[in-house]
Design a protein with these regions (language model features):
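Phosphate/pyrophosphate-binding loop motifs in nucleotide- or prenyl diphosphate-using proteins
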Residues: 1-187
Length: 187
């Protein structure tokens, strides 16, 4: 199978089910943001030394493929009710993220100030992933304002952003990198 079809050369793409839409459509923007997030997390995973953390990100990347597929499927909530939905994020995925957050937070000192994104290279990439995740979340929210979607992907992305923040902090802690604190300037 060839990677190119020329079918998108006029600015349209096919959703699951065959419907053709503009590449600028909110649904395409939403799953495109999720795809970008997945790529950023792949870069971060390549920089991680700890096998347990790499495994977490690999699990998340698989879930993001499921989420992208769900977003690329019009009427996914209705299809799910009829037992016709494909892979998708589940409540268990949100619970898993919460468990990982709780576990990693036991390694960290409580925050008393805002911190500046950065530190070890992997942590900096995770902070980048966190901000891309928030953008993806906003795109999915925007999609939900114009079309019927399951609210679970929004919850998943919200929790994932929290997880990426905590994971970045844990990576810095394990690397012995002090997190720079934000010090506001009075003007």
């Amino acid at each position: 199978m060839k990677i190119y079809t020329r079918g998108g050369d006029a600015g349209e793409t096919s959703l699951f089910g065959g419907e053709r839409v503009r590449k600028s459509a909110p649904r395409v923007a939403a799953y495109g943001e999720v795809d970008e997030l997945n790529s950023v997390l792949g870069i971060a995973r390549a920089e991680l030394e700890a096998a347990d953390l790499r495994a977490m990100l690999e699990t998340i990347q698989s879930s993001l493929f499921d989420l992208g597929g769900e977003l690329a499927t019009p009427n996914a909530p209705e299809r799910s009710a009829k037992g016709k939905a494909g892979p998708r994020v589940a409540e268990d995925d949100v619970v898993e993220l919460e468990g990982w957050i709780d576990r990693l937070e036991t390694e960290l000192e409580p925050l008393r100030n805002f911190i500046l994104p950065g530190g070890a290279r992997a942590a900096a990439l995770l902070h980048l992933g966190r901000t891309v995740c928030r953008r993806a979340e906003r795109a999915v929210i925007s999609l939900g304002e114009s079309e019927s979607i399951d609210p679970l992907p929004i919850r998943y992305l919200n929790r994932l952003s929290d997880f990426l923040f905590v994971l970045a902090r844990a990576v810095n802690k394990r690397a012995g990198v002090t997190e720079p604190q934000w010090i506001g300037r009075e003007r």
